[in-house]
């Protein structure tokens, strides 16, 4: 597959159609462009209670240091980390960077009550693991968070969406919010996340990509 040349200052853009056409489902690898997709969350009115809950959810109370209830859980996490690190090596060649990224994905996924497999699939589709990806509609970072969210539930500084943990926290909290609104329906929740509620291409792409990150332990 041919990729567009990468702009050294800002990520270029591929259309969602071209990104989705590159998916090969059914045990094969899923290939994506080096650029972000064009979907975007839609700003909607939030009840005060919801806004307060989301604001609290993104508050940075602790660094992403995994905690385990027993040795077995810790060993399973370490096995997951090794397996995911091997799969991510082509995208992030440096071990320390891979480790920090995966550790943060795991932490923020668990914190938001999400399956880390789903989160990794979403990141693959949204940004192809590009920290500084920017879409044609302005969504930023790994999880392509729209800047308006920093105003709605953050401090208004959209530049922080290029910070790894901040982006992953916002993304996970927003995804959790959308899934809750859809009563746990992944298809509809993912559609909301992408601003394409009720349409199949995006949810199908994320759920397909998530298969690349399944781990049996």
Regions found by a protein language model. Give the residues of each.
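C-terminal segment of N-terminal export signals and the immediately downstream linker at the start
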Residues: 12-15, 31-52, 56
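Catalytic glycan-binding domains that act on GlcNAc-containing polysaccharides
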Residues: 59-217
């Amino acid at each position: 597959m041919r990729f567009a040349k990468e702009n050294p200052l800002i990520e270029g853009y591929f259309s969602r159609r071209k990104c989705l056409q590159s998916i090969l489902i059914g045990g094969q690898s899923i290939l994506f462009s080096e650029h972000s997709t064009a979907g975007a969350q839609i700003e909607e009115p939030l009840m005060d209670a919801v806004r307060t809950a989301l604001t609290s959810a993104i508050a940075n109370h602790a660094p992403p240091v995994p905690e385990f209830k027993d040795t077995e859980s810790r060993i399973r996490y370490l096995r997951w980390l090794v397996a995911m690190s091997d799969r991510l090596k082509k995208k992030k060649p440096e071990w320390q960077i891979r480790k920090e990224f995966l550790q943060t994905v795991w932490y923020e996924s668990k914190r938001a009550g999400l399956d880390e497999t789903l989160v990794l699939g979403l990141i693959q589709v949204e940004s192809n693991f590009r920290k500084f990806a920017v879409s044609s509609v302005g969504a930023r970072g790994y999880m392509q968070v729209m800047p308006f969210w920093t105003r709605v539930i953050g401090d208004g500084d959209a530049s922080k969406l290029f910070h790894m943990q901040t982006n992953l926290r916002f993304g996970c909290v927003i995804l959790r919010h959308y899934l809750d609104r859809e009563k746990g329906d992944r298809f509809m929740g993912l559609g909301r996340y992408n601003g394409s509620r009720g349409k199949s291409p995006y949810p199908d792409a994320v759920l397909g990509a998530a298969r690349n990150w399944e781990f049996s332990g």
